[in-house]
Amino acid sequence: MPVPALCLLWALAMVTRPASAAPMGGPELAQHEELTLLFHGTLQLGQALNGVYRTTEGRLTKARNSLGLYGRTIELLGQEVSRGRDAAQELRASLLETQMEEDILQLQAEATAEVLGEVAQAQKVLRDSVQRLEVQLRSAWLGPAYREFEVLKAHADKQSHILWALTGHVQRQRREMVAQQHRLRQIQERLHTAALPA
């Protein structure tokens, strides 16, 4: 109960006292003492209620502050989760791009290997022709066979050079594929790490 109301109650109790200067009798004195005790009891009850109110208000303030901190923590965690999702999405996009590049390199390597096979077959045919001409030249060193031999020999040298260049190209592609696979593994590891719970 608020203190002003208690004061008003005390004033009313004083008004109810007899205005005469004569001493109070037994019943009047008892009634006055009862009113005094009632006032003091009401005052103590009001003070106790006021203390309970202030304590409760303090607890509510602490609870509001705790809820505010909890809400802020939830908000920060939500931001972290959002950033983690964005990072995982970027890693997936990078992984897809790397896989596409690896597929392209694989197709190029297969096409180059096919060309190398054809060149190797052509070179074998050419070597066989050169060997046949060498046999013919043993019997006739001069003449059209010799000129044909020189042409075929030059062609064989050219084919050997092309084969050598293609072999180097295949080796470079293999090195690129190895590097690409290493990069792909790194991205997969990062993606797996990003997906793990904190």
Swiss-Prot record:
Changing residue 59 to W: Lover plasma LDL-cholesterol and HDL-cholesterol levels. One of its GO terms (cellular component) is extracellular region. Residues 1-21 form the signal peptide. GO terms for molecular function: hormone activity. The keyword Magnesium does not apply. Induction: In response to food intake. Stimulated by insulin. GO terms for biological process: cell maturation; fat cell differentiation; lipid metabolic process; positive regulation of protein processing; regulation of lipid metabolic process; regulation of lipoprotein metabolic process; triglyceride homeostasis. InterPro entries: ANGPTL8. The keyword tRNA processing does not apply. Keywords: Diabetes mellitus, Hormone, Lipid metabolism, Secreted, Signal. Proteolytically cleaved at the N-terminus. Predominantly expressed in liver. Also expressed in adipose tissues. It is found in: Secreted. Belongs to the ANGPTL8 family. Interacts with ANGPTL3. Hormone that acts as a blood lipid regulator by regulating serum triglyceride levels. May be involved in the metabolic transition between fasting and refeeding: required to direct fatty acids to adipose tissue for storage in the fed state. It is linked to Type 1 diabetes mellitus: A multifactorial disorder of glucose homeostasis that is characterized by susceptibility to ketoacidosis in the absence of insulin therapy. Clinical features are polydipsia, polyphagia and polyuria which result from hyperglycemia-induced osmotic diuresis and secondary thirst. These derangements result in long-term complications that affect the eyes, kidneys, nerves, and blood vessels. Type 2 diabetes mellitus: A multifactorial disorder of glucose homeostasis caused by a lack of sensitivity to insulin. Affected individuals usually have an obese body habitus and manifestations of a metabolic syndrome characterized by diabetes, insulin resistance, hypertension and hypertriglyceridemia. The disease results in long-term complications that affect the eyes, kidneys, nerves, and blood vessels. This is Angiopoietin-like protein 8. It comes from Homo sapiens. The gene is ANGPTL8.
